[in-house]
From Swiss-Prot:
Name the UniProt record assigns to this protein: Siroheme synthase
Residues with PTM Phosphoserine: 128
Pathway this chain belongs to: Cofactor biosynthesis; adenosylcobalamin biosynthesis; precorrin-2 from uroporphyrinogen III: step 1/1; Cofactor biosynthesis; adenosylcobalamin biosynthesis; sirohydrochlorin from precorrin-2: step 1/1; Porphyrin-containing compound metabolism; siroheme biosynthesis; precorrin-2 from uroporphyrinogen III: step 1/1; Porphyrin-containing compound metabolism; siroheme biosynthesis; siroheme from sirohydrochlorin: step 1/1
Organism: Shigella dysenteriae serotype 1 (strain Sd197)
Active site (catalytic residues): 248 (proton acceptor), 270 (proton donor)
PANTHER family registered for this protein in UniProt: SIROHEME SYNTHASE (PTHR45790:SF1), SIROHEME SYNTHASE-RELATED (PTHR45790)
EC assignment: 2.1.1.107, 1.3.1.76, 4.99.1.4
Binding-site residues for S-adenosyl-L-methionine, renumbered to this chain: 225, 301-303, 306, 331-332, 382, 411
GO biological process terms held by the UniProt record: cobalamin biosynthetic process; methylation; siroheme biosynthetic process
Segments for region (Uroporphyrinogen-III C-methyltransferase): 216-457
Entry's family note: In the N-terminal section; belongs to the precorrin-2 dehydrogenase / sirohydrochlorin ferrochelatase family.
Length: 457
């Protein structure tokens, strides 16, 4: 280990930055956030430093560097574009046993600045030891996505509860289980974010007083249309906290690779016209796992409330008194259209969008007359096997045969395939495609040649 990671208490302690440009300004922000009593020395300063000085937030010393500026300092930063001056600052600090950071010169520095994820009081620092700042930044960005923005408020509140929790729960195991419940409780986090004292008190009392072997909960999570990058941050957080993940065929392998490693995985894949696991059995799986006290994630492709039967599953849980929540996902219509260069609405071509299930059941005739109207976009989910019927019905109700259509297979994935044509060709086009596919019908499809960005990558 070349560097020891430490967190310094700098509040009301003298610190010095030598340099008055943009780089020095970024370092100054960090020290000001930490409450340091900051002096900045340079021949000239960018306007931000002047504004801070006018507000009484720091002291400016205009002129050449004077080593006496270090006499009362706990920490120094050399942030000029003059390598010789930076080296002089570093040597003067070293002689006084003051830690000094030299920007872009880690070998000349006695400490380096990490990439920081700030969820105060929770802090995470990432460093590559100065060898690859870009790598450290990328890791920080990834960690940022994993740590909810409200986490700091929850951590601060947990500190206030420590005494009571110690009195309430006799063993370390009981306390650990309580803290695990508290840190994943979305209602408490939201209440803290909203400063809703009544809800904070109610939720805290419920968590403290309920038995530790309480029933579990189910979180319905939309996995998006395929590209793992389209999974929401909250969806990612939920699948990494799950004890059990119940997932279907439309959830990509890339997304399943993000699931917590020791979570149980239950596959309940479905295909149009055939159910690997009957819906009622899926409902019972969710119920059974939650009743064991487990945190269950029901992971569905797209958005669970758009042709995902999410409402049916939640009704079962509601009737059994099982707590549940929902994390929306990007629905296939949005993802597939965007990755195909087809805007669902357009000022000149479509003022509305219809999302329609392609599972056309006997006795469930659609309103084809309204669907055939102009100035709208039709998106058929699971309509591949019914493409010829869709073509026939729309033409019978006076939709022009030259109306542009597109079929998107494996939308947003690297294996995405799109074919387009006209309504009179829809049935034949569908024979060339495989499930999962989405059918888009409307004038907006004509913009695909101009706006198709994804296939050009």
């Amino acid at each position: 280990m070349d560097h020891l990671p430490i967190f310094c208490q700098l509040r009301d302690r003298d610190c010095l930055i030598v340099g008055g440009g943009d780089v020095a300004e970024r370092k100054a922000r960090l020290l000001l956030d930490a409450g340091a009593r900051l002096t900045v020395n340079a021949l000239a300063f960018i306007p931000q430093f002047t504004a801070w000085a006018d507000a009484g937030m720091l002291t400016l010393v205009e002129g050449p560097f004077d080593e006496s500026l270090l006499d009362t300092c706990w920490l120094a930063i050399a942030a000029t574009d003059d390598d010789a001056l930076n080296q002089r600052v570093s040597e003067a600090a070293e002689a006084r046993r003051i830690f000094c950071n030299v920007v872009d010169a880690p070998k000349a520095a006695s400490f380096i600045m990490p990439s920081i994820i700030d969820r105060s009081p929770l802090m995470v620092a990432v460093s590559s030891g100065g060898t690859s700042p870009v790598l450290a930044r990328l890791l920080r960005e990834k960690l940022e996505s994993l740590l909810p923005l409200h986490l700091g408020q929850v951590a601060k509140y947990a500190g206030q509860l420590r005494g009571r929790v110690k009195q309430q729960f006799a063993t370390m195991g009981e306390r650990r289980r309580f803290w695990e419940k508290l840190f994943v409780n979305d209602r408490l986090a939201q209440s803290l974010a909203n400063n809703d004292q009544k809800a904070i008190t109610e939720t805290t009392e419920q968590l403290i007083n309920e038995p530790l072997d309480h029933r579990g909960e189910v979180v319905l999570v939309g996995a998006g249309p395929g590209d793992a990058g389209l999974l929401t941050l909250k969806g990612l957080q939920q699948i990494q906290q799950a004890d059990v993940v119940v997932y279907d065929r439309l959830v990509s392998d890339d997304i399943m690779n993000l699931v917590r490693r020791d979570a149980d995985r239950v596959f309940v894949g479905k295909r149009a016209g055939y159910h690997c696991v009957p819906q009622e059995e899926i409902n019972q799986i969710l119920l059974r796992e939650a009743q064991k006290g487990k945190r269950v994630v029901r992971l569905k492709g797209g958005d669970p409330f758009i042709f995902g039967r999410g409402g049916e599953e939640l009704e079962t849980l509601c009737n059994a008194g099982i707590p549940f929540s929902v994390v929306p996902g990007i629905t296939a219509a949005s993802g597939c259209s965007a990755y195909s260069g087809i805007p669902l609405t357009h000022r000149d071509y479509a003022q509305s969008v219809r999302l329609i299930t392609g599972h056309l059941k006997t006795g469930g005739e659609l309103d084809w007359e309204n669907l055939a109207a102009e100035k709208q976009t039709l998106v058929f989910y699971m309509g591949l096997n019914q493409a010829a019927t869709i073509q026939q019905k729309l033409i019978e109700h006076d939709m022009p045969g030259e109306m542009p259509v597109a079929i998107v297979e494996n939308g947003t994935a690297v294996t995405q395939r799109v074919i387009d044509g006209t309504l009179t060709q829809l049935g034949k086009l569908a024979q060339q495609m495989n499930s999962p596919s989405l059918i888009i019908i409307g004038r907006v499809v004509g913009l695909r040649d101009k706006l198709n960005w994804f296939s050009n990558h």
